[in-house]
Every structure is written in structure tokens, then in C-alpha cells.
Amino acid sequence: MKADLVSGLLPIREDGCMLLLQRPTGTWEPPAGRLQPGESFEEGAVRELYEETGVLVSPQRIIATWVGEAASGRPLASVTYAGRTDRAEVRLSEEHLDHRWVTLGEWMSLPSWWSPENIKRIAGPVETVRIVGAVREPPLPSLREDTGVVTANLGAGAVLVDLGGVEPRALLLRRRKPPVGLWENPGGMLEEGEDFEACARRELFEETGVRARIEDAWWARVEPWRKPEDPELYAGVGFLARHQGGEIDPEATAHDAAQWVTETEWHTLRTWYTRRESDVLWKAIKEMEP
């Protein structure tokens, strides 16, 4: 499944109020827009926020993902971040009618593409960013020529976490296919009608035989699909999932071994992830409620 990529960034003040912008249609949404070529989800979110409001905020946590259709009928895939700010002044772009700093409750009373259920779902992540997020301004985003939409093949996966021991453990599966021997978490490509969460849930069950609740997204990436010079792009989102019991039964055609590993053990194995990404993952795992 392919879709045009969108990224957003919700600024959060110390008092818990969030910045929403009123679009010409009258709805109130977090600052967001389409990615430009060469951007990551985070870079696109920072640029869009700055272009639309003049505010600089560092993305500190993914609070929502979405896959659906634009008003034009084109498929869209979006990742929304949150970040702390101490700025109150907003330089509104001509694309918008107004702006407001609102609470979650006030947001739910406004017309919005976000449903009340989806707004309620971000209450926990938003509160975490408000309490522990540091106010950090990123560098000024690079000026990029608007060369049209960025379309990518969509994928998702989940790191299955066991919180029942002395320290958290995560499940890794060893690949049978190239790169043979690499350790990875369950994941794959979206099928028609799926969003990122549904894909992660299905892939987790298909590759482990375990059904688990998909929790927070901890990672999102845009990169060349099959090789560095590939003109086609891949856009993936990684989630956490809580192991609630059941024996791991690896899909035999894809993996030849499975093991539960601690953070220390994870870093000794060859995975898809950089050290920085692994550190972000384990920070998110440690923040999961027992």
C-alpha cells in the first residue's frame, strides 16, 4: 500500500494547553503538512510548524499515527509528534484563519478532523510530554522547494515486551532471508484497508502466534525502499506491544529462532536499528506501566 506522507507537531505549554490552527474549512487541527523530498517525519513536522506559526519546537514523542484518504481521495499517511514549548507568540501563516491554545477538553468541543476518541487517546502521551519534556528549540529548518507530494510504501512493526521479570525484555526473531541472521521484531507492509496499528497487530500475530495489545508508537522512518539508490520510498512506524502470555511460535518461512533479550543483550546483537534508535526504544520500554 502506498500513500502521500504527512507530518504534524503539537506544541504543548507547561500549563498543558496545546496549539491548534483553524483551517479555511473551519476545523481546528495541530500544525501539519505534507513532507518534502528528502525529509524525515521529524524534519517535516518541525518545518511545517515553523512555516505555519513561526514557532520552533523539537519533536519529543509520537502521539498519533493515521492512514486514510484526503478530501481529494488520495491516500494519506501521517505521523503526529508533540513537543514542549514556552512560546506564547504565534506568527500565523496566510493558510490559516486563527489559532488557539486549548486544553484537551476544549479541543473536543471544537470542529476537528480528529474524533473525540482519538483526542482522548493522546491524553497520556501529551501529559508525559508536559511533565518530562524539555523545552528545546531545534535549528532553523532548511528552506525547501515545494516539488510536490512525497509518496511511500507503508510498513509497520511491533516490539513485543515482557514486563513480568526483574527487568524488561523484548522479543527478537532471527531472519532466514537476506540479510540472513539479522535479529528483528515482527513487521511488514500494510495491506489495503489497514492503518499502521492494524498492520503491526496482524504482523505480530502472523510471525509469533501471539495476540497482543498495540501500545505507543516509538519510532518512524522514511528511507529508500530496497537499497540506498532506490527512487521508491519506504515509510514505517514502530510500536510497542505488551506480552500477556502465550508461547512464541516463529513463522518458519521467515525466522529460524526467537529469543527474549534485556537491554544489554539487545545491544550485543545485529539488528536493523542504530544505537540512537535502540536507546530511544529502551527508554520507551522503561516508561511502560507494569
Task: Annotate each PLM feature.
Residues 14-51, 166-206:
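Conserved Nudix-box catalytic region and its N-terminal flanking loop in Nudix hydrolases
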Residues 15-17, 71-74, 163-169, 228-231:
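Short, solvent-exposed loop/turn segments that connect beta-strands within catalytic domains
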Residues 117-141, 276-290:
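Charged phosphate-binding loop/patch that engages nucleotide di/tri-phosphates or the phosphate backbone
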Residues 8, 17, 98, 157, ...:
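Conserved beta-strand and immediately adjacent loop positions that scaffold enzyme active sites
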Residues 3, 26, 75-77, 152, ...:
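Residue-level preference for beta-strand/loop junctions
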